[in-house]
A protein has these predicted regions:
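Short, Lys/Arg-enriched, Trp-marked, Pro/Gly-tolerant hinge/linker segments that flank
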Residues: 147-159
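Cyclic nucleotide-binding regulatory module and flanking cytosolic helices
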Residues: 1-46, 95-96
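Short phosphate-coordinating micro-motif centered on Lys-Gly-acidic
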Residues: 49-55
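Cyclic-nucleotide recognition modules
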Residues: 81-138, 145
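Short, small/polar residue-rich loop motifs at catalytic or cofactor-binding pockets
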Residues: 36-37, 55-57
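Phosphate-/nucleic-acid-contacting segments
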Residues: 157-162, 167-235
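Glycine- and acidic-residue-biased ligand/ion/polar-headgroup-sensing regions
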Residues: 47, 58-71, 87-88
Length: 235
């Protein structure tokens, strides 16, 4: 389902998602309006693909509600889960810069709503104001910085601390339920299912979370943040 964006249709929660995003929130009111006018609302049901690896560029997106999985299917038939996108996160800008096909598969993990900024709208935007190339470049470099941080974490941090960091990244004070199976969470962290289950049990015994099939619920997010930052629970 796709409909042209009516700015008045953005509810308070959706506006808050955009305003609290560091990239979008750095723009002036006029720049925000200029970008949003090019947006189109997209609605996805759980399990519905947004686009597939190899597909042509169709626009840049931002998640307003729900969660999306980015994954890749190896030629061996094994699927690699790369990351989970939550409200306020942008995607699709790589293919905008290099004009190459999509690098990975993206599908909705839950019922989701997004804003799409189609290719033709983006072309019109940068023609009107070439500085948008620099602004979109800043969005891309934010992703690169996060990627380097994650690579460093994988090399240096113990598995429990990396798990805590990822759980904090996938949640906030209002969203404490993470709709992931334990095996999926392990794939995001490059941990075995056995190791992931063992670490989750330890965190559950400490009262930080509880697990149900397909869902991880955080019970003490502040303590989890401490573990993510310091590698241990502070008294």
């Amino acid at each position: 389902m796709e409909a042209k964006l009516d700015l008045s249709a953005l509810n308070h929660a959706e506006r808050l998602v955009l305003q609290t995003d560091l990239w979008f929130g750095s723009f002036s009111d006029a720049q925000q309006q200029q970008l949003l006018q090019q947006g189109r609302r997209r609605v996805l049901s759980a399990g519905q693909p947004l686009f597939s690896r190899g597909a042509p560029f169709c626009g840049i997106y931002v998640v307003l509600q729900g969660q999306l999985l980015i994954s890749g299917l190896h030629q061996s038939g094994q699927q690699a889960l790369l990351t989970l996108l939550t409200p306020g996160q942008w995607l699709g800008e790589i293919a905008w810069f290099d004009q190459m096909p999509r690098t990975h598969d993206v599908q909705a993990l839950t019922d989701s709503q997004l804003l799409q900024f189609p290719k033709t709208a983006l072309q019109q935007l940068v023609q009107q104001d070439p500085l948008w190339w620099q602004r979109f470049g800043q969005l891309l470099t934010v992703k690169l910085r996060l990627l380097f941080v994650e690579l460093e974490d994988r090399a240096l941090l113990p598995a429990k601390q990396r798990l805590a960091r990822r759980l904090c990244q996938l949640s906030n004070d209002q969203q404490l339920q993470i709709p992931l199976q334990q095996e999926q969470l392990g794939q995001l962290l490059s941990l075995s299912r056995q190791t992931t289950n063992q670490l989750l049990r330890q965190l559950a015994e400490a009262g930080l979370l509880q697990t149900r099939y397909g869902t991880i619920e955080l019970l003490n997010r502040p303590a989890l943040v401490q573990l993510a930052q310091h590698g241990t629970l502070l008294s």
